[in-house]
Amino acid sequence: MSRIVMVHGAGNDLWGPSSIKSRWFPALADGLAWHGVAIDEHDVTVAFYGDLFRKDPEDGYEPAVDRAGAIATVEELVQRLDPHVDLAELTKMLTENHFDRLLAQAAAYLQQPSLRSAARSRVADAIGPDTRVVVAHSLGTLVSYEALCAHPEWSVTDYITIGCPLAGDIIRDRLDPAPSDGVSPWPGSVLRWTNIVDPNDPAGRTTPCGRFGGQVTEYKVDNGHRVHDPEPYLNNRWTGQAVAAGLAAG
């Protein structure tokens, strides 16, 4: 089994594990190159669950979570934090950047037990005795966090989250396992958790530091106009540093 397992985020229902790996592997290799570390494709596996969201009209599919409803939920939460926020501008930003689609899939994951279980099983199937590093993006941080918590017997030592929405209360309160006294459980066998965030990424604005029962190391990056895209997160030197540390320790 691979030493590194990568868990994609929402919005990948029209892709597949090979196509995701073709984009993510070179980006991660560039991140590791900052530190003189080389990997080959056998070192990396993509835990793919995007097909669980891919339903065609021939299947008689009705979207379980309305995208407009997802936006309304976000608007309500943001307005609680800042009653003066321009909701029209917020809606425009969410729609133009496809966050409405991403939010709808995140909501479906949290609300549909069978989908949730199937996604977590995909992560479990990808992780083996040689896996030391898990890199997760966006919705993939929810799936991988819950899988890691459910399997403390795994040998994963390093957890790297990018574009991570885990710490937001609307997400964290619905995780399995749920927080206790305001603190969520540490993810299983993990020894080091590194969170990489672009401060302009709407998904990652709430830090997991201090909220998960252990020390999370966090680095801020600038992804330019691609604030939530995985590739600029992966090719960053801080991501490379965290993955390199996990490989060296293993």
Where are these predicted regions, by residue range?
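Lipid deacylating catalytic domains
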Residues: 1-67, 71, 84-135, 139-250
